[in-house]
From Swiss-Prot:
Any one Gene Ontology cellular component term annotated for this protein: cytosol
Record's protein name: Thymidylate kinase
EC number(s) reported in the record: 2.7.4.9
Source organism phylogeny: Bacteria, Pseudomonadati, Pseudomonadota, Gammaproteobacteria, Pasteurellales
Xref: InterPro entries: P-loop_NTPase (IPR027417), Thymidylate_kin-like_dom (IPR039430), Thymidylate_kin_CS (IPR018095), Thymidylate_kinase (IPR018094)
Length: 209
Protein backbone atom coordinates (compact mmCIF):
# COMPACT_ATOMS: atom_id res chain seq x y z
CA UNK A 1 0.00 0.00 0.00
CA UNK A 2 1.26 3.47 -0.88
CA UNK A 3 1.90 5.68 2.13
CA UNK A 4 -0.17 8.86 2.31
CA UNK A 5 1.18 12.40 2.50
CA UNK A 6 1.03 14.99 5.28
CA UNK A 7 0.28 18.59 4.26
CA UNK A 8 0.26 21.33 6.91
CA UNK A 9 -1.12 24.86 6.95
CA UNK A 10 0.70 27.42 9.08
CA UNK A 11 0.24 31.11 9.84
CA UNK A 12 -0.85 33.57 12.47
CA UNK A 13 -4.46 34.31 13.36
CA UNK A 14 -6.61 35.58 10.50
CA UNK A 15 -4.38 34.16 7.77
CA UNK A 16 -7.24 32.17 6.24
CA UNK A 17 -6.31 28.56 6.93
CA UNK A 18 -9.89 27.33 6.48
CA UNK A 19 -10.10 28.83 2.99
CA UNK A 20 -6.69 27.37 2.17
CA UNK A 21 -7.71 23.93 3.41
CA UNK A 22 -10.71 23.92 1.07
CA UNK A 23 -8.38 24.85 -1.80
CA UNK A 24 -6.05 21.97 -0.98
CA UNK A 25 -8.99 19.56 -1.00
CA UNK A 26 -10.10 20.77 -4.43
CA UNK A 27 -6.60 20.32 -5.82
CA UNK A 28 -6.28 16.82 -4.35
CA UNK A 29 -9.71 15.80 -5.63
CA UNK A 30 -8.67 16.94 -9.11
CA UNK A 31 -5.87 14.36 -8.90
CA UNK A 32 -8.18 11.59 -7.74
CA UNK A 33 -7.15 11.83 -4.08
CA UNK A 34 -10.27 11.55 -1.92
CA UNK A 35 -9.23 9.63 1.22
CA UNK A 36 -8.33 12.66 3.35
CA UNK A 37 -8.07 13.11 7.12
CA UNK A 38 -8.24 16.56 8.73
CA UNK A 39 -6.40 17.41 11.93
CA UNK A 40 -5.86 20.49 14.06
CA UNK A 41 -3.31 21.47 16.67
CA UNK A 42 -3.59 21.53 19.51
CA UNK A 43 -6.32 18.89 19.49
CA UNK A 44 -7.47 15.96 17.44
CA UNK A 45 -7.65 13.27 20.14
CA UNK A 46 -9.64 13.19 23.40
CA UNK A 47 -6.56 13.99 25.50
CA UNK A 48 -5.25 16.58 23.03
CA UNK A 49 -8.63 18.35 23.02
CA UNK A 50 -8.52 18.61 26.82
CA UNK A 51 -5.04 20.10 26.57
CA UNK A 52 -6.33 22.51 23.91
CA UNK A 53 -8.82 23.91 26.40
CA UNK A 54 -6.05 24.49 28.94
CA UNK A 55 -3.80 26.11 26.33
CA UNK A 56 -6.35 28.32 24.60
CA UNK A 57 -8.47 29.53 27.51
CA UNK A 58 -7.87 31.31 30.80
CA UNK A 59 -7.55 29.08 33.87
CA UNK A 60 -7.63 29.73 37.61
CA UNK A 61 -3.85 30.07 37.59
CA UNK A 62 -1.49 31.70 35.07
CA UNK A 63 -0.05 29.30 32.49
CA UNK A 64 3.72 29.71 32.30
CA UNK A 65 5.36 29.83 28.89
CA UNK A 66 7.19 26.55 29.42
CA UNK A 67 4.08 24.81 30.73
CA UNK A 68 2.26 25.99 27.59
CA UNK A 69 5.06 24.61 25.42
CA UNK A 70 5.04 21.22 27.14
CA UNK A 71 1.26 20.92 26.84
CA UNK A 72 1.54 21.67 23.12
CA UNK A 73 4.08 18.88 22.65
CA UNK A 74 2.02 16.46 24.72
CA UNK A 75 -1.01 17.18 22.53
CA UNK A 76 1.12 16.96 19.39
CA UNK A 77 2.61 13.55 20.06
CA UNK A 78 -0.82 12.14 20.96
CA UNK A 79 -2.12 13.34 17.60
CA UNK A 80 0.91 12.16 15.62
CA UNK A 81 1.05 8.67 17.12
CA UNK A 82 -2.68 7.99 17.43
CA UNK A 83 -4.08 9.69 14.33
CA UNK A 84 -1.59 11.00 11.78
CA UNK A 85 0.87 8.11 11.52
CA UNK A 86 -1.86 5.42 11.38
CA UNK A 87 -3.72 7.39 8.69
CA UNK A 88 -0.57 7.79 6.59
CA UNK A 89 0.22 4.09 6.96
CA UNK A 90 -3.25 3.30 5.58
CA UNK A 91 -2.54 5.41 2.49
CA UNK A 92 -4.68 8.34 3.59
CA UNK A 93 -3.65 11.94 3.05
CA UNK A 94 -3.62 14.19 6.10
CA UNK A 95 -4.24 17.95 6.04
CA UNK A 96 -3.15 19.54 9.29
CA UNK A 97 -4.20 22.90 10.70
CA UNK A 98 -0.83 23.65 12.36
CA UNK A 99 2.03 21.37 13.36
CA UNK A 100 5.47 21.79 14.90
CA UNK A 101 6.35 24.99 13.03
CA UNK A 102 3.65 26.72 15.09
CA UNK A 103 5.55 26.01 18.30
CA UNK A 104 8.82 27.09 16.74
CA UNK A 105 7.20 30.38 15.69
CA UNK A 106 4.79 31.15 18.53
CA UNK A 107 6.85 29.89 21.45
CA UNK A 108 10.27 30.50 19.91
CA UNK A 109 9.40 33.84 18.33
CA UNK A 110 6.38 35.19 20.15
CA UNK A 111 7.25 33.87 23.62
CA UNK A 112 11.00 34.17 22.96
CA UNK A 113 11.75 30.80 24.54
CA UNK A 114 15.22 29.31 24.20
CA UNK A 115 15.84 27.93 20.71
CA UNK A 116 17.93 25.06 22.07
CA UNK A 117 15.02 23.97 24.27
CA UNK A 118 12.67 24.02 21.28
CA UNK A 119 15.10 22.07 19.10
CA UNK A 120 15.65 19.49 21.83
CA UNK A 121 11.92 19.00 22.36
CA UNK A 122 11.29 18.66 18.64
CA UNK A 123 14.03 16.06 18.19
CA UNK A 124 13.11 14.15 21.34
CA UNK A 125 9.35 14.07 20.77
CA UNK A 126 9.04 13.94 16.98
CA UNK A 127 12.40 12.65 15.80
CA UNK A 128 12.54 12.71 12.00
CA UNK A 129 8.77 12.96 11.55
CA UNK A 130 7.79 16.06 9.56
CA UNK A 131 5.21 17.22 7.01
CA UNK A 132 5.73 16.41 3.35
CA UNK A 133 4.63 19.95 2.52
CA UNK A 134 3.97 23.06 4.61
CA UNK A 135 2.03 26.01 3.23
CA UNK A 136 2.79 29.13 5.25
CA UNK A 137 0.10 31.80 4.92
CA UNK A 138 1.96 35.07 5.44
CA UNK A 139 0.01 38.11 6.62
CA UNK A 140 0.70 41.33 8.51
CA UNK A 141 -0.49 40.89 12.12
CA UNK A 142 -2.58 44.07 11.99
CA UNK A 143 -4.66 42.70 9.12
CA UNK A 144 -4.68 39.16 10.47
CA UNK A 145 -5.91 40.15 13.93
CA UNK A 146 -8.52 42.42 12.39
CA UNK A 147 -9.88 39.41 10.51
CA UNK A 148 -9.70 37.24 13.63
CA UNK A 149 -11.64 39.77 15.69
CA UNK A 150 -14.35 39.72 13.04
CA UNK A 151 -14.93 36.04 13.84
CA UNK A 152 -15.85 36.75 17.46
CA UNK A 153 -14.19 36.64 20.88
CA UNK A 154 -10.42 36.06 20.92
CA UNK A 155 -8.87 33.21 22.92
CA UNK A 156 -5.90 33.46 25.30
CA UNK A 157 -3.30 33.21 22.54
CA UNK A 158 -5.10 35.59 20.19
CA UNK A 159 -5.23 38.22 22.95
CA UNK A 160 -1.44 38.65 22.99
CA UNK A 161 -0.12 42.09 22.07
CA UNK A 162 0.85 43.11 18.55
CA UNK A 163 4.59 42.80 19.22
CA UNK A 164 4.05 39.12 20.07
CA UNK A 165 2.55 38.50 16.63
CA UNK A 166 5.22 40.51 14.83
CA UNK A 167 7.87 38.34 16.50
CA UNK A 168 5.88 35.22 15.62
CA UNK A 169 5.60 36.27 11.98
CA UNK A 170 9.31 37.08 11.79
CA UNK A 171 10.19 33.65 13.16
CA UNK A 172 7.81 31.97 10.73
CA UNK A 173 9.52 33.74 7.83
CA UNK A 174 12.95 32.63 9.08
CA UNK A 175 11.81 29.02 9.44
CA UNK A 176 10.27 28.91 5.97
CA UNK A 177 13.38 30.35 4.35
CA UNK A 178 15.39 27.41 5.67
CA UNK A 179 12.80 24.72 4.96
CA UNK A 180 12.85 23.30 1.41
CA UNK A 181 9.49 21.62 2.05
CA UNK A 182 7.73 24.91 2.86
CA UNK A 183 6.02 27.36 0.50
CA UNK A 184 4.92 30.90 1.34
CA UNK A 185 1.50 32.13 0.25
CA UNK A 186 0.67 35.86 0.41
CA UNK A 187 -2.41 35.76 2.65
CA UNK A 188 -2.98 39.53 2.53
CA UNK A 189 -4.65 39.12 -0.86
CA UNK A 190 -8.35 38.53 -1.42
CA UNK A 191 -9.62 35.13 -0.32
CA UNK A 192 -10.19 34.14 -3.94
CA UNK A 193 -6.59 35.00 -4.88
CA UNK A 194 -5.24 33.14 -1.85
CA UNK A 195 -7.33 30.12 -2.84
CA UNK A 196 -5.96 30.33 -6.39
CA UNK A 197 -2.36 30.52 -5.16
CA UNK A 198 -2.84 27.59 -2.78
CA UNK A 199 -4.30 25.40 -5.53
CA UNK A 200 -1.43 26.40 -7.81
CA UNK A 201 1.15 25.52 -5.14
CA UNK A 202 -0.45 22.11 -4.58
CA UNK A 203 -0.65 21.47 -8.31
CA UNK A 204 3.04 22.31 -8.74
CA UNK A 205 4.02 20.11 -5.80
CA UNK A 206 1.94 17.15 -6.98
CA UNK A 207 3.44 17.25 -10.46
CA UNK A 208 7.07 17.72 -9.41
CA UNK A 209 7.47 15.66 -6.22
Amino acid sequence: MTTGKFIVLEGIEGAGKTTARDSIVRALHAHGIHDIVFTREPGGTPLAEKLRQLIKHETEEPVTDKAELLMLYAARIQLVENVIKPALAQGKWVIGDRHDMSSQAYQGGGRQLDQHLLHTLKQTILGEFEPDLTLYLDIDPVLGLSRAKGRGALDRIEQQNLDFFHRTRQRYQELVRHNPKAVTIDASQTMSKVAEDVESAIETWLTTR
